């Protein structure tokens, strides 16, 4: 079973988080993003967004890819498909914070550049990302892209795209998750709410940070009927079952619980 969920426990801890394997020590420090694959390997982006590491399940460094190799510019997300190919959300930044272009870059299982599978030009002066999520498939990647009033979900494996109508998506949405089996879209808004898309035009509110003091939900991922979000305010993981019986029954996990249970590792 292909693991399709990003390791959001790393994302929320960001620059302060470190991990050491007790048998073959390897330390991650200043991490900005990480994800796992079906073999138990971890892909890590450092806080400069210019270096990516692949670490084996037993803590060995398998390879390192750097922006200086001309494979990418500034990596903000990373996932691996079922074939072992690696996909990066790559961003070109100009004048400090302004985004000139975004893309999806494909690397081989050895970390070598293969191609750019998607490219999105940014509006002049924009500081917000248009690509707001990635989900690996068996032979490719699904990525979510904001448009004015919709989220475009594109599947590189199938060469297909589908638009989900979401009012003011460009200004409201921070990030997305997608479940291919149920064709379900989830998203986090800048004001700290998590929604599930519905065809009715009234999307279902799954979580509202206004009801939890200090909560700031960020990156989300979906796996086996459960939605996870890194809470950078409370420094834990929001866990939201999304099956028919338990939708809305939110609970929370510590980073240690998440690692132990392998739910989002």
PLM segments and residue spans:
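N-terminal Sec-pathway targeting helices
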Residues: 1-3
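Flexible "stalk/tail and boundary" regions
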Residues: 5-265
């Amino acid at each position: 079973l292909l693991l399709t969920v990003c390791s959001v426990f790393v994302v929320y801890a960001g620059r302060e988080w470190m991990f050491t394997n007790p048998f073959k020590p390897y330390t991650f420090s200043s991490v900005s993003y990480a994800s796992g694959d079906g073999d138990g390997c971890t892909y890590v982006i450092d806080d400069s967004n210019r270096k990516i590491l692949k670490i084996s399940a037993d803590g060995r460094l398998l390879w390192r890819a750097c922006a200086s190799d001309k494979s990418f510019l500034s990596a903000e997300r990373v996932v691996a498909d079922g074939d072992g190919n690696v996909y990066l959300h790559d961003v070109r930044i100009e004048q400090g914070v302004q985004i000139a272009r975004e893309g999806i870059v494909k690397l081989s299982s050895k970390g070598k550049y293969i191609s750019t599978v998607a490219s999105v030009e940014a509006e002049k002066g924009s500081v917000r990302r248009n690509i707001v999520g990635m989900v690996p498939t068996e032979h490719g990647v699904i990525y979510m892209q904001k448009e004015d009033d919709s989220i475009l979900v594109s599947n590189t494996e199938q060469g297909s795209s589908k638009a989900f109508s979401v009012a003011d998506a460009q200004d409201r949405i921070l990030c997305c998750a997608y479940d291919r089996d149920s064709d379900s879209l989830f998203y986090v808004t800048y004001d700290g709410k998590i929604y599930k898309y519905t065809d009715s035009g009234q999307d279902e509110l799954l979580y509202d940070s206004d009801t939890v003091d200090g909560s700031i939900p960020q990156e989300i991922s979906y796996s086996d009927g459960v939605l996870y979000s890194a809470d950078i305010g409370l420094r834990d993981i929001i866990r939201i079952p999304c099956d028919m019986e338990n939708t809305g029954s939110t609970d929370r996990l510590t980073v240690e619980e998440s690692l132990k249970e392998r739910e989002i590792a």
